[in-house]
Design a protein with these regions (language model features):
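Extracellular/secretory pathway-exposed regions associated with glycan biology
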Residues: 3-83, 87-163
């Protein structure tokens, strides 16, 4: 047909989340945490909330110094070697099944570190610890598997409990 040309196929993907099941619990701690992450076992959270991902976005945060923990369970569909990434300003650590897999602690500008982790199919606990000593606020956790490329962990794979 004159004036027509073949167009590229448009693709979009959506992740369905269930607010009763999917989510990340975050804990907020007031204080001066200069230089390194605090010992969270000695602190009481000043605030607690829920989000759908491990990120500072969409959380109303004050200026100044504070620390946070993000706690969830990650559903792994296929066993294998996964690469996890944590990007933060200031310090952070990432734990999978209560084992620290990335130590990005100390005061610094936005810096991303990564680590490979062998995971079985099923649910795995995931926790990110973070502190802010002033300046820019950055925290994000992403992963890759096989040829998938690095991506934020889909909200549909983060669960409030292991059930």
């Amino acid at each position: 047909m004159k004036g027509c040309r073949e167009s590229n196929e448009a693709k979009e993907s959506y992740h369905v989340i269930d607010p009763a099941k999917n989510g990340v619990t975050w804990l907020f701690y007031k204080g001066e945490f200069k230089g390194k992450l605090p010992d969270f076992s000695k602190l009481k959270p000043a605030k607690k909330g829920e989000s759908y991902n491990i990120s500072l976005k969409k959380i109303d945060l004050p200026g100044g110094s504070y620390a946070m923990q993000f706690i969830s369970n990650l559903k792994i569909a296929k066993a294998g070697k996964y690469t996890f990434y944590i990007n933060s300003n200031d310090g952070s650590r990432l734990f999978i099944d209560n084992t620290m897999v990335i130590d990005n602690d100390s005061e610094h500008g936005a810096r991303e570190l990564s680590s490979e982790v062998e995971l079985t199919e099923g649910m795995h606990s995931i926790r990110a610890d973070y502190f802010q000593a002033g300046g820019g606020k950055v925290l994000s956790v992403s992963y890759s598997f096989g040829n998938s490329g690095k991506q934020f962990i889909p909200e549909s794979l983060l669960f409030k409990s292991k059930e």
